[in-house]
Amino acid sequence: MSLRRPPLPRLLLNNVSCMRNAQQILRHVNVSLHDGGALVLMGTNGSGKSTFLRMLAGFSKPSAGEILWNGHDITQAGIFHQYKLQLNWLSLKDAIKDKFTVLDNVQWFEVLEGKQGGSLPALELMGLGRLAKDKARMLSMGQRKRVQLARLLAIDRPIWLLDEPSVALDGDGVKLLEYIIAEHRKKGGIVIVATHLPIQIEDAMILRLPPRFPRRMTLVDMLDRGG
């Protein structure tokens, strides 16, 4: 009787260190994510969360250690080409064209992916179905973020890298975000979130980034010290 080897993690950070502007952000991080896994990067503004996400996306290399996808180093040219096709990236820049309709702003990305038919249902799920034919310039900041989330659903890649996904969302929008993350994970998708705001993601691993700069003393701090 032969023993089965445990499955490789889909994504493995092996003793990874990350630097920005010659400053260490994280040192010797070890994380393994299997299908359906989630990682939350917590930290204040300026702590390096976006830099860390960009490293996971392959835009920069670790200062030490390695990032493995299916057991292969993502910095290798042939591997990176395959790896990047697995990624769905949501950044603080929404890339929404104001002159296009709301539907066009999702459909264009779906067509580039070689897919069709998912854009309108994605917008409807995000509560924007009635605005599909409106120009995107009419959208509020929260609605623009919902358009970005609709793109995630329409493109439907397995690994989501989400940079501050709840910023500009109201309470209902945050609940929708948490719902689509949970549904993506049920299908075996992986979610990595960088945030300074609370978000409910069941069984997620938490990685806390130390503040890059000491917090400035406020009037409340001074009064506390004086008391």
Residue ranges and their predicted role:
Residues 57:
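Helix-to-loop junction immediately C-terminal to a conserved catalytic motif
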Residues 93, 98-114:
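Q-loop/switch helix immediately C-terminal to the Walker
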Residues 117-132:
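Conserved ABC ATPase "signature" region
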Residues 65-76, 81-83:
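Conserved ABC transporter NBD signature motif
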Residues 149, 188:
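Hydrophobic anchor residue at the start of the ABC signature
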Residues 160-164:
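Catalytic Walker B motif of ABC-type/P-loop ATPase nucleotide-binding domains
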Residues 135-144:
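Conserved ABC ATPase signature
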